Amino acid sequence: MYALEIEHLKKTYSSGTKALKGVDLKVEKGDFFALLGPNGAGKSTTIGIVSGLVNKSAGSVKIFGYDYDTHQAQAKSCIGLVPQEFNFNQFERVIEILVNQGGYYGIPRPQAYKRAETYLRQLELWDKRNDMARELSGGMKRRLMIARALIHHPKLLILDEPTAGVDIEIRRSMWDFLTKINKQGTTIILTTHYLEEAESLCKNIAIIDHGRTIEDTSMKTLLSQLNTETFILYLQSPINDTHNLKSHDLSPFDIHVLDENTLEISIHEKMQFNHLFKLLTDNGIQVLSMRNKTNRLEQLFMRLVDKNRNNSELIETLEQTSHTENLDG
């Protein structure tokens, strides 16, 4: 049994817009799963359907075995949703937002209060418990929405751009919290524009584009498709004529001199870093520090999306041709 199982999901709005043309997803229990795609790909529609906020046109959705068509109440009780927008009463006190949310799920106030205290402390909001929501910063509001989504102890937590507009320090603390609850058994689905976030947190990934699933695999398998990575090396002393960057030993590497103290080197993923640094040292080059220039997930993401768009244009052309032929017939 999967935490989330989606098959042939389609959605056509009353305007005629086809938001989803066949999305298939399987999310294992206990997974930390990334759902990515460019703007307009269908991510928000998919999340809306899974959360019970949008009606599907076709296909099936199961949450921990509960089919939305036959057991919607049970399916929805398994889900906690953190949407992009701040959709709570800005003039309500923080603690009351959480306790009242618990009431929607039949949780007695004393029990809801204890849960609220636990999450507010973990998310560093306890000292704000009696503040109005409107008095919170953007980052605090994001954390409040996570606490609200967790108040009924859902098995599946869905986060739609949870760290948008949040500074780096708060983002890191949110990552730590989400990693902790995932290790405790909560299945998490994350959509984000911060691809570093997906790469750091998620075990598995699906990419949606033009309303279709174009990739559904493990993060490790996806990243293994990269052949090269590019690094910026900062040197202890300037490059001079005694340094042989064109030596036979360094020939497998693509080396560019950015300035007298900086090199850009592209290496094959199977080459060893230790071997590279030994070769540089042997050729009189001492490295002070380095950084990875390649955003690996972004590189793969763009490659897959570009490939899919070419395929989508072909599919749509064939579908239109078939439709025209049927009308003529």
Task: Show the residue positions of the predicted features.
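A short, flexible loop at the N-terminus of ABC-type nucleotide-binding domains that lies
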Residues: 1-6, 11-22, 72
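Conserved ABC transporter NBD signature motif
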Residues: 59-67, 74-75
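Conserved ABC ATPase "signature" region
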Residues: 99, 103, 110-128
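Catalytic Walker B motif of ABC-type/P-loop ATPase nucleotide-binding domains
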Residues: 157-160
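ABC transporter nucleotide-binding domain
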Residues: 175-267
